[in-house]
Amino acid sequence: MIQVSYVPREYINSCWKQVEGYLKKATEYTHGRYEVEDLYLAVCEFGHLLWIAFDEEEIKGAVITNVIVYPKKTYLCLAFCGGKEFSTWKDPMLQMLRNWAKDNGCQGLEAVGRKGWTKVFKHQGHKFLWDTFELPLDEG
């Protein structure tokens, strides 16, 4: 049976090696903005939260979130997600994150990701809001 849990900061080192590979794959879609070491620092030093999905045998997936305080609203951002057998833990993870967000004064959840995530979330009541555009600047 799949369970999901927040990982308190003092326990991150005990499970990091098991989730590092999942999260490394997620950083490959950041176009050089993040490496997996940056995610480790984010959860250990900068207030991001690590969540895991697991069964009696192994950790199946990991999500990193952070709270974003906008001038008018506060959202829990699902910043990074990775794992295997996603369909087995997606719903319990989203329910846990919804509950945590409500209990901590957030007005909603948000995620930034590639277009494929639209299919994942469309049955969950999520809506697509916008695209992001990038203009790299020459460094020379």
Task: For the regions a language model picked out, list residue spans one by one.
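Short amphipathic alpha-helix that is part of the acyltransferase structural core
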Residues: M1-Y34
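Long, low-complexity, intrinsically disordered polar/charged segments
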Residues: G21-Y34, A53, Y70-C81, R98-K102, ...
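Active-site rim helix/loop that mediates acceptor-substrate recognition in acyltransferases
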Residues: E28-H48
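Conserved donor-binding loop and adjoining core beta-sheet/short helix segment
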Residues: E45-S87
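Short glycine-aromatic motifs
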Residues: G47-H48, H123-K127
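Acyl-donor binding region in acyl/amide transferases
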Residues: P71-Q124
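Conserved catalytic-core motifs of GNAT/GCN5-like acyltransferases
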Residues: V112, K127-E139
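Flexible, glycine-rich phosphate/dinucleotide-binding loops
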Residues: T118, E139-G140
